[in-house]
Amino acid sequence: MRVSSVDSLLTNNNITIDEQLVKNDDNFEKTVDMLEKFKGNLFNWYSTEDCTVLEPRFISTVDSGNFLCSLTALKEGLKEYYSECPSLAETVAKIEEIIANTDLACLYNRRRKLFHIGIYPDTCEKSKSFYDLYMSESRLTSYFAVANRIVPKNHWSSLGRIFVGGGRRCGLVSWTGTMFEYFMPCLFLPSPEGSVSYESLRFCLQNQRSRAGRKPFGISESGFYA
């Protein structure tokens, strides 16, 4: 089980409640509580059989950020149902406790003003690589960290913004040009029409379509490295 699967579960929980498909329960809280963590951060991989951490024992910065954003979306969604189910306040309080106890700052490099890719908790060795581009799946983590004053505001301006042209459009580059890097943060972050993010998304979409021709388009992580 990857921590990103937990993120999806939390987001889907909101949807199923909205659609009245299932009732909210606190099983996820109990599961998160029992999982081994490092400074509140979930490890990248857990066994689906006994929830023990799988090798390599690694904390992913972007997955931790996605987890926190998913929790935030869930708790704000649950607040809409207080009138129907007052006991949800206890669930929200527990979620807020989980968020407060998750230390993103341990993944941040103040000298570089950037987040490391991750950390190996057993040795406290941080990755030598950084999330240094704005157009990346990590911009969700960066936004959350700045908005919650976990890192300084100048981190946002430290993210690289390199423009390139292609076809009739131009936009910011990502490291591998995948749909995941460009579009994943849109699950939570708006990209207003005319903004750099909006134009970069259209730039990415145009190039993905152009490259595929008449074939299905949309290169993402799994397809890119296959």
Predicted regions and their residues:
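Ser/Thr/Asn(+Pro)-rich, low-complexity disordered segments
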Residues: M1-A226
